[in-house]
């Protein structure tokens, strides 16, 4: 696929190629040897399961067609993949295979007319040319692949005057190879659909001209009509609409966008007209990074794959030597029935190609990674996928992960008679303007709502203390804002902190304001749980996974969250510093493989310590995204158990593929040893095993069959299905109308349990 990801200074372009000649990982070195000798190729990578080669090259030195020519000189059957190809081409077998098959069928009529037997030889000649070309290319590189082994089997059967079997070998091998290529191409279509999400054209709002997205710079205003895809990441500067973000986040419901809302490339404007000011170049958009991440993951090898590849290096030589022994030793011993032993040697020889076994892991991994990516669950490496299937403990951060991080100030007070509330709020909001914590935005919004204008320019020496709070110097005063621990930072003994928490119970997050060592103010913050958290925790428990919550918030706030989740969490730790979270993760890892889910700076050490770290891609900080092994593209925690089930299914498919590839070849060899050495069956088993492995792995690309939920939530006019006695409670999770209504709850628990004290 000639993809327009160019660097003007270096004239670089990324091109994608379908390379049918890649059967398994053993061909990767062949591709490498070819491309390293081509002038202008800067870097390349090979994705074996989809038979894809990705090449970054200088367009002034070499074109995609010249790269195709170089690959085809090695008989790799390469072609340029059109950009974002998403349709499956109906392709017939090669003319060689068709002619060979017709002649083979006609040769079976030899029992009625004996001269037709010679048509089998013609069938061999007609169909053997593609096999011969690939076999010669393989031998010249001092390798014995399945084409070379099959050619040896064909020549040997011809020498034994078994013409019909020779023709059968050629025809079955050609058809199986065609079916295998078609299946691999079908698997690659899903990956191609990811790359074609973002449109290639954008309309400049000022002029109405349509230009290539690669020519659109940052801060350019583009227009997007209803029904069109947003071309580049940006911010809405005019208009409003509903946007379908399912392609990136997996979120089924439209998201409302107004002025200053962030929008992403490849999402669809469902209604309305908007103008978007771009905030990134096309190559730096979320969808581009997402595609790159998936490609990198698919190129990576799992531990299982590395082990199988290592074993396969010794498998083929050992089998070839064994086949030679079965052919030579009977001759030396002057055994009478040499034909049987020669056929047995050929069966063993054809079984010497371990392609099916080598493909068993990467194809399943490829399909699982692709399916996860299309669901908004980005897994960075194959090893992460393997580890994900073995997780025993999942730890969650609270703020921004379990809860929405949409704080609301419920109480702000000055505790010093000499400082009025207006002045204190001005100090706090000015300092918080320099912080990226979700609580900071709530304090700023509260200040603006009471007509206090933050002035970040007056803040000096701003400092952030993870797990504690922030500091800033204003008007010659040292101001500290944070939780209990900030008191020690301010020089105030915690024992001297007034017990103001008694009036701030019921799960509210409490903040303190110090001027020097003196406590001068306090505030309360309210936060609610995300939709679906309780349901996700129950699903994890059904998978036999233990859940925990790690938070730097106070004990009351932590226990209030636990109550909202109907005590779904197994373990709750509160008032933790970032290093405390990392230490607890170490303790969990002693019990079993551990996963950490977080979204902020305070989670980075714990994410790094865990066997698997999941960062929230939409709400998460840049550091958390880099630290995490998996990126959750939306804030829907329910994708985590879904991703874990996919990982377990992938692990199961790998085992099935290994058993399938070994057992089929084993069965053919057993038949040979007990007196039925069928060479054509051995050829069919070898090529057929690869096909079965691919088809079995492609089951992972299907949607997982899920039970119909009793409760549905929608941001549009979609129907809501509740139990009959709960029809009135249509605003589950919002402020309840009465005490009677508040006692009712959503039947599935997807709205996070009891709804007491939740805010609209």
From Swiss-Prot:
EC id: 7.2.2.12, 7.2.2.21
Effect of residue 397 to A: Loss of metal transport
Disulfide-bonded cysteines: none
Induction: Not induced by cadmium or zinc treatments.
Localization (cell): Vacuole membrane
Chief subcellular location: membrane
Tissue: Roots, stems, leaves and flowers.
Pfam (any one): E1-E2_ATPase
InterPro entries named in the record: ATPase_P-typ_cyto_dom_N (IPR023299), ATPase_P-typ_P_site (IPR018303), ATPase_P-typ_TM_dom_sf (IPR023298), ATPase_P-typ_transduc_dom_A_sf (IPR008250), Cation_Transport_ATPase_IB (IPR051014), HAD-like_sf (IPR036412), HAD_sf (IPR023214), HMA_dom (IPR006121)
GO molecular function, one term: metal ion binding
GO biological process: detoxification of cadmium ion
Entry binding sites for Mg(2+): 599, 603
Cytoplasmic side stretches: 1-89, 135-141, 185-310, 360-654, 699-760
Regions that span the bilayer: 90-111, 115-134, 142-162, 164-184, 311-333, 342-359, 655-674, 679-698
Keyword Ion transport on entry: no
Protein family: Belongs to the cation transport ATPase (P-type) (TC 3.A.3) family. Type IB subfamily.
Cited PANTHER family: CADMIUM/ZINC-TRANSPORTING ATPASE HMA2-RELATED, INACTIVE CADMIUM_ZINC-TRANSPORTING ATPASE HMA3-RELATED
Name of the protein in question: Cadmium/zinc-transporting ATPase HMA3
């Amino acid at each position: 696929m000639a993809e327009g990801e160019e660097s003007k200074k270096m004239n670089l372009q990324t091109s994608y190629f379908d390379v049918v000649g890649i059967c398994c990982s053993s061909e990767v070195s062949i591709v490498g040897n070819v491309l390293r000798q081509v002038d202008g190729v800067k870097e390349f990578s090979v994705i074996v399961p989809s038979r894809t080669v990705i090449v970054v090259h200088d367009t002034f030195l070499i074109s995609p067609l010249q790269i195709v020519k170089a690959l085809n000189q090695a008989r790799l059957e390469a072609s340029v993949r059109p950009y974002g190809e998403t349709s499956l081409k109906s392709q017939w077998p090669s003319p060689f295979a068709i002619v060979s098959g017709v002649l083979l069928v006609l040769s079976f009529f030899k029992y009625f007319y004996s001269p037709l037997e010679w048509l089998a030889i013609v069938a061999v000649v007609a169909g053997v040319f593609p096999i011969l070309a690939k076999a010669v290319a393989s031998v010249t590189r001092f390798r014995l692949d399945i084409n070379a082994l099959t050619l040896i089997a064909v020549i040997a059967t011809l020498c034994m005057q078994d013409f019909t079997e020779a023709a059968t070998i050629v025809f079955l091998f050609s058809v199986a190879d065609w079916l295998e290529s078609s299946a691999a191409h079908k698997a690659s279509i899903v990956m191609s659909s990811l790359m074609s999400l973002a449109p290639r054209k954008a309309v400049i709002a000022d002029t109405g001209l349509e230009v290539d997205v690669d020519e659109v710079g940052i801060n350019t205003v583009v227009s997007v009509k209803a029904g069109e895809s947003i071309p580049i990441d940006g911010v809405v500067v005019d208009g409003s609409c509903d946007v379908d973000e399912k392609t990136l986040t997996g979120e089924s419901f439209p998201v409302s966008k107004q002025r200053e809302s962030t929008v992403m490339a490849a999402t669809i404007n469902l209604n309305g007209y908007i103008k978007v000011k771009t905030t990134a170049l096309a190559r730096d958009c979320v969808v581009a990074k997402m595609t790159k991440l998936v490609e990198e993951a698919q190129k990576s090898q799992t531990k299982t794959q590395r082990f199988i590849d290592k074993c396969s290096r010794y498998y083929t030589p050992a089998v070839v030597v064994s086949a030679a022994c079965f052919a030579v030793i009977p001759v030396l011993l002057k055994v009478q029935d040499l034909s049987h032993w020669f056929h047995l040697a050929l069966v063993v020889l054809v079984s010497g190609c371990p392609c099916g076994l080598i493909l068993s892991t990467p194809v399943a991994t490829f399909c699982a990674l692709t399916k996860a990516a299309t669901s908004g669950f980005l897994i960075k490496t194959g090893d992460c996928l393997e580890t994900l299937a073995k997780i025993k403990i999942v730890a969650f951060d609270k703020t921004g992960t379990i809860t929405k991080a949409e704080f609301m100030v419920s109480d702000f007070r000055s505790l010093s008679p000499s400082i009025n509330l207006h002045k204190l709020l001005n100090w706090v909001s000015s300092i918080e303007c320099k912080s990226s914590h979700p609580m900071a935005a709530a304090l700023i919004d509260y200040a603006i709502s009471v007509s206090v204008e933050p002035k970040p320019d007056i803040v000096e020496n701003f400092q952030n203390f993870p797990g504690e709070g922030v500091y800033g110097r204003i008007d010659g005063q040292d101001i500290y804002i944070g939780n209990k621990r900030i008191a020690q930072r301010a020089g105030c003994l915690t024992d001297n902190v007034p017990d103001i928490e008694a009036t701030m119970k019921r799960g509210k997050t409490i903040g303190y304001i110090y001027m020097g060592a003196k406590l001068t103010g306090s505030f309360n913050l309210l936060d609610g749980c995300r939709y679906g958290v309780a349901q996700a925790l129950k699903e994890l428990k059904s998978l036999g996974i233990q859940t925990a919550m790690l938070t730097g918030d106070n004990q009351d706030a932590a226990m209030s969250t636990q109550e909202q989740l109907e005590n779904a969490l197994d373990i709750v730790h509160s008032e933790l510093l970032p290093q405390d979270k990392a230490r607890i993760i170490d303790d969990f890892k002693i019990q079993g493989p551990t996963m950490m889910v977080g979204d902020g700076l305070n989670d980075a050490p714990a994410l790094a310590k865990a066997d698997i770290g999941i960062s929230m891609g939409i709400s998460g900080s840049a550091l958390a995204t880099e630290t995490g092994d998996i990126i959750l593209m939306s804030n829907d925690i329910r994708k985590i158990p879904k991703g874990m089930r996919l990982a377990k299914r992938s692990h199961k498919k790998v085992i099935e593929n290994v058993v399938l590839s070994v057992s089929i070849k084993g069965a053919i060899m057993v038949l040979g040893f007990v007196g039925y050495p069928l060479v054509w069956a051995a050829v069919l088993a070898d090529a057929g095993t690869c096909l079965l492995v691919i088809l079995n792995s492609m089951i992972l690309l299907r949607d997982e069959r899920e039970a119909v939920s009793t409760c549905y939530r929608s941001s549009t006019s979609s129907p809501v299905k509740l139990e009959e006695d709960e029809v009135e409670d249509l605003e589950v999770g919002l402020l309840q109308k009465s005490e009677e209504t508040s006692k009712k709850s959503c039947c599935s628990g997807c709205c996070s349990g009891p709804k007491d004290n939740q805010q609209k």
